């Protein structure tokens, strides 16, 4: 049913994830949300943890994060970005003084945040022929 091969995955824009290091989250005090998402089996946490699974370069990666959240997602995002860069990934951090809700709601509006995300996408886009 495919008339041509899919184009390669070019880039990721991660919006305010606070779960780059699942093992660390689960070993410390955390929201019940994480128990629902990742379960109560420590043996599974490493397999579910993006930073633990990062062993080779990824396509370009932009981590958008909130600087106002008490769980400090920018700290985890920065650690992930640094690890990805060491492996050769073109990775960037975009910290914003917005809540998680505001990060999701304001993307696409006429603001500097949307412009930064668009610039990242354009930098890593390609022409489909």
Where are these regions (language model features)?
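Alpha-helix termination/capping residues and helix-transition junctions
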Residues: 6-7, 55
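C-terminal catalytic histidine-bearing segment of alpha/beta-hydrolase fold enzymes
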Residues: 64, 75-81, 85-129
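Conserved serine/cysteine hydrolase catalytic core
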Residues: 50-58, 75
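A conserved short beta-strand
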Residues: 7-19
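Short glycine-enriched nucleophile-adjacent loop
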Residues: 1-5
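Acidic catalytic loop of the alpha/beta-hydrolase fold
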Residues: 68-72
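Mobile cap/lid helix-loop segments that gate and shape the active-site cleft of serine hydrolases
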Residues: 17-53
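Short beta-strand/loop motif that positions the catalytic acidic residue
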Residues: 57, 62-66
